Amino acid sequence: MNPCERQEPRKVALYANVGADLTHYDVDVAGAALIKRATVTLPAGVQYAWPHVSRRYLYVATSSSASGYGPAGTEHHVTALRIDPASGALTKHGEAIRLPTRPIHMTTDIPSENILVAFNNPSALRVYRINHDFTPGDEVKQGGPIDAGIFAHQVRVTPDNRLAILVTRGNEGTPTKAEDPGALKVFDYKNGVLTNVVSIAPDGGRNFGPRHLDFHPTKPWMYVSIETQNKMYTYQMEAGRINPEIAFRAETLAEPKNRRSRQAAGTVHVHPNGRFLYGANRAQDTVDFQGKKVFKGGENSIVVYSIDQSTGAPTPIQHIETRAIHPRTFHIDPSGRLLVAQHNLPAAVRDGDAIRTIPAGLSVFRIGDDGKLTFVRKYDIDVDSKTMFWMGMVQL
């Protein structure tokens, strides 16, 4: 090839589920478009997925349980899917492994030698080997009981592969039940073994409901969405540890003093260039209107922050509506030019004196050089009685 010719950008595949069905889409990054391809069916509803570091395999956690504290099912698995390096197509790879209860989140460690799985009810953290043939393998025996807090929601391994962090949200208080405290459970991590847990829980975990975290790609900064308080907290990593003091606090909502319904901060992703941070705001409460339950109002949006490159402090620079209800998940393409948000359920909304339905689906945004988002299009998806729960993009 003539060295003066520009190389073709690498292809990107997007995967999104409806229940147990996981559909592959080609991603046209330049055109900000998704092209639907084939669908594979997993043993039960997709909960989360994580690619192998080689980007040739996708590990998918599934469950027949309902979300939250809903009815418990009996089918819980991790399945390996092979990613075709040319097309992105998925095919089953080997046998699935059984899990004891519903997995809510999963990741691999940095070299993809082990799979870490978070369970919410009961809260737990388990580690499974990745076999030499890339299939999921046996559980790693731990030295003792694991302190998994209350209602785990995410597990991540620090970029240096030395710590595993279990994000435990706790539960909001109700008129009849006291608040369950939240915490970040930080473990030393080596070869799949978890030891020496440290619990980061400001004020004993009261008014601290963390949901999701992400790491800066080059600096020792960690960003945590506080779901129940609608905040974004910044933590600093020092000498291989996490400083338990909150370095910076930022709002996630555009109108924090004008809450029309329950607001819940959600997914967090740092831009690949490390200059911007993105978080999801979710609302879905309903009110009666003409005998039907309709959306009560609230912020379903992506908040964009500029990151101070000397301190790590995030400053909100944009709040943009996602054009649907409850953006549970979003992801940024590896080139940092596209953001796609997934909405899990259809919702009825008022339209003057009428009622219309906003379908579930995928909203596509361009990311500008200034980090700000521009809405391009939404792909409506008929989920029937199922749920869109996870989506993500993988560079081929």
Regions found by a protein language model. Name each.
Residues 16-18, 67-76, 118-123, 173-182, ...:
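Short, solvent-exposed loop/turn segments at conserved positions within beta-propeller repeat blades
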Residues 25-32, 80-88, 127-137, 186-194, ...:
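Short loop/turn segments immediately following beta-strands, especially the blade-tip
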